[in-house]
Amino acid sequence: MKKIALFGGSFDPPHYGHFALCTLTRELFSPEKIILSISKNPLKGSANAPEAHQLAMAKLMAEELGKTGPVFEVSDWELRRAGFSYTIETLRHFHAIEPNAELLLCIGEDNYQIFEKWKAYQEILQLAHLVVFARSGTQGEQQSSRIIPPERYTWVQLDLPLSSSDLRREIAEGQDWQAKMPSSIAAHIAAHRLYQNEK
């Protein structure tokens, strides 16, 4: 059965931490494709990039990733929907497109810890295998395993010092941030003066 990995997020902006997650997923699971699904940020403010720029930067990210391996795709399905999408709705969408593929849903440890609060979480476990990325040394794996069968998730430890929120602040403050992402994305941010309103 072919595998399709799904990364959801605003990627606002994309950085080398996102690249590390994608390349590690490729190495561990050998998916036929990795889909970057751009989602709306319910906490979006003036400091965030407009959705058109989020999509453009995600496409640049996919182009850079595509130089190193299998096909990387960008989906704007969630952006085009009215309102905000729940993860289960996104999974149903991709399952309808690829009914014979195994979906790998890549999430962070923070979301894993509150997984039982997600809408239709039991159906999520039926539609997808969870790939949980956690910082090395954390002990959170046991805390939610009571509701997630061990065969339905894989725990991956990886240290990622970068965060998009920190990058937005550094850009606004004029710090040295360009080396934390590919030059094509840094050039897009500079050309359009993104993240200048972060406080």
Curated annotation (Swiss-Prot):
Please list every transmembrane segment annotated in the UniProt record, as residue ranges. Answer: none
| Superkingdom of origin | Bacteria
Q: Which Pfam families match?
A: CTP_transf_like
Q: Please, one GO biological process term?
A: NAD biosynthetic process
Q: Name one GO molecular function term.
A: ATP binding
- From which residue to which does any coiled coil extend? none
User: Which Enzyme Commission number(s) are on file for it?
Assistant: 2.7.7.18
Q: In which pathway does it act?
A: Cofactor biosynthesis; NAD(+) biosynthesis; deamido-NAD(+) from nicotinate D-ribonucleotide: step 1/1
Give UniProt keywords alphabetically: ATP-binding, NAD, Nucleotide-binding, Nucleotidyltransferase, Pyridine nucleotide biosynthesis, Transferase
> InterPro entries from the entry?
Cyt_trans-like (IPR004821), NadD/NMNAT (IPR005248), Rossmann-like_a/b/a_fold (IPR014729)
Q: What reaction does this enzyme carry out catalytically?
A: nicotinate beta-D-ribonucleotide + ATP + H(+) = deamido-NAD(+) + diphosphate
Q: What does this protein do?
A: Catalyzes the reversible adenylation of nicotinate mononucleotide (NaMN) to nicotinic acid adenine dinucleotide (NaAD).
Q: Which family does it belong to?
A: Belongs to the NadD family.
Q: What is this protein called?
A: Probable nicotinate-nucleotide adenylyltransferase
Organism, as annotated = Chloroherpeton thalassium (strain ATCC 35110 / GB-78)
Encoded by which gene? Answer: nadD
